[in-house]
Swiss-Prot record:
It holds the Pfam family MJ1316. Coiled coil: none annotated. Belongs to the UPF0248 family. InterPro entries: MJ1316, UPF0248. It comes from the Archaea. Disulfide bonds: none annotated. This is UPF0248 protein LS215_2790.
């Protein structure tokens, strides 16, 4: 399954529990090199980027996405 398909599946099939899902990305500015982004922060996804709801209009390239997890039970939904 492609990243875009996994993101869209969660956004549409689990929208009532969207806060329970996070996207883990590579982030060079953090100490451990990883950053968690809640699905509630996600505005859109296309074939190349994730677009976040923010004043800075943050755009994240999909090649930085490592995995998608469910927080409640730490289940791995998708992994590169």
């Amino acid at each position: 399954m492609k990243i875009k398909d996994a993101v869209n599946m969660i956004r549409w099939e689990y929208r009532e529990k969207i806060d329970d899902y996070v996207i883990i990305i590579i982030d060079r500015l953090t100490e451990n090199g990883l950053k968690e982004i809640s699905f509630s922060e996600l505005d859109a996804v296309d074939n190349n980027y994730l677009y976040l709801k923010s004043e800075e209009n943050t755009v994240i390239p999909l090649h930085r996405v490592l995995m998608i997890k469910r927080k409640s039970d730490n289940a791995l939904i998708w992994k590169r």
